[in-house]
């Protein structure tokens, strides 16, 4: 039986304005405000977000934690830590960690009964993960989640740049054809 993937959308835009239950933050292991989407989410949520993540102290790559959304339209934020790509290291391990990152997102979202979620491109910015490989891993992990769960969660992939947007759009078009 073919699954209906109409609950997945690809959006090129500002994730901080997403009207969803939860926004995913591409966080660093120390959970302190950093650059890129992490900076934008902390700015939009207000100083309470930085205080809320302090209680966790640390989050290993592949894992995630959840906090309230504070000044965001979203009621919660999942802070997910992706791998830092280094092609001189074990790249297969990096791939497994990126997959685990998205698994952690979906597990937390399910645990907290999140009905709609906005997810950025994790690790493909300053963490330098190859965008095409990351997109493939994201889709494999997302499809595994959707095909094995009863979730009706709406998933919005927010892409900041054209390359990620085009990669994600192609994957979704293939899926729906």
Explain the meaning of each model-derived region:
Residues 85-177:
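Phosphate/ribose-phosphate-bearing ligand recognition and processing surfaces
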Residues 1-112:
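Glycine-/small-residue-enriched capping loops at alpha/beta junctions
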């Amino acid at each position: 039986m073919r699954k209906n993937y109409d609950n997945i959308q690809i959006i090129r835009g500002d994730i901080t304005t997403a009207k969803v239950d939860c926004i995913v933050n591409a966080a660093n292991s120390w959970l302190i405000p950093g650059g890129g989407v992490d900076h934008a989410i902390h700015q939009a949520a207000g100083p309470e977000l930085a205080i809320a993540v302090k209680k966790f102290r640390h989050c290993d790559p592949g894992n995630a934690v959840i906090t309230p959304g504070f000044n965001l339209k979203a009621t919660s934020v999942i802070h997910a830590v992706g791998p830092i790509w280094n092609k001189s290291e074990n790249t297969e391990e990096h791939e497994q960690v990126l997959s685990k990152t998205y698994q952690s997102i979906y597990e937390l979202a399910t645990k907290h009964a999140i009905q709609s979620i906005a997810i950025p491109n994790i690790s493909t910015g300053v963490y330098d993960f190859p965008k095409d490989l990351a997109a493939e891993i994201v889709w494999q992990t997302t499809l595994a989640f959707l095909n094995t769960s009863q979730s009706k969660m709406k998933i919005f992939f927010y892409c900041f740049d054209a390359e990620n947007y085009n990669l994600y759009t192609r994957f979704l078009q293939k899926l729906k054809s």
